[in-house]
């Protein structure tokens, strides 16, 4: 298995795709996707465009759909939900399809949607993601951070490091594909016992604190608390594996 880390979709090779793409947006898209599927959502369908989200979701019965939209960390007023995983309770999402568009995470999913395997990872489901990689053993794996508007994101990098660290503990012969893997490992090993404090210091963490999303940060900083693997069944549509 050859492992690569890319901090944003824009930094990936333009002429290549991995056997398995692991998309990361800890604050908050992939955390929300994992939480929604764990709570019984039928599927999560991701869109980079809010207009496309509205158009496609309009073909679904209102009682079978939820629209989740976020721009700049804040809820889009035309949508039912924003991008908070804490809103995705069984009472709200069970049996429904979540149509979601966010500032960063949905763009990352779109970049790799034609990969053979696409899964969504966050700290909360890190162990389940690693278990899948150990079971399926794809030849090339991209850990793809979503970043923030094309720039580096501390929380996505530390999650990539957390996945790589656990994978290396359980699998011999993992080939390190780029220097970003080494940097992500070092970042995680420095902060692994104090991830929430790191989130408070990060630029997007500061942005969310300004929107009074303290509880979201606490939830998103937890490691290995959900046994759920969001996996793409068709481009842009993720289901529980």
Curated annotation (Swiss-Prot):
Top-level taxon of the source organism: Bacteria
What EC number(s) would the UniProt record show?
Answer: 3.1.3.71
The coenzyme or cofactor needed here is: Mg(2+)
Top EC class for this record: hydrolase
State the Gene Ontology terms under molecular function: 2-phosphosulfolactate phosphatase activity; magnesium ion binding; sulfopyruvate decarboxylase activity
Q: Give the reactions, separated by semicolons, that this protein catalyses.
A: (2R)-O-phospho-3-sulfolactate + H2O = (2R)-3-sulfolactate + phosphate
InterPro entries assigned: ComB-like, ComB-like_sf
Keyword entries, A-Z: Hydrolase, Magnesium
**NCBIfam families, A to Z:** PRK00886.1-5
Family according to the record: Belongs to the ComB family.
Protein name from the UniProt record: Probable 2-phosphosulfolactate phosphatase
Question: What species does this protein belong to?
Answer: Gloeothece citriformis (strain PCC 7424) (Cyanothece sp. (strain PCC 7424))
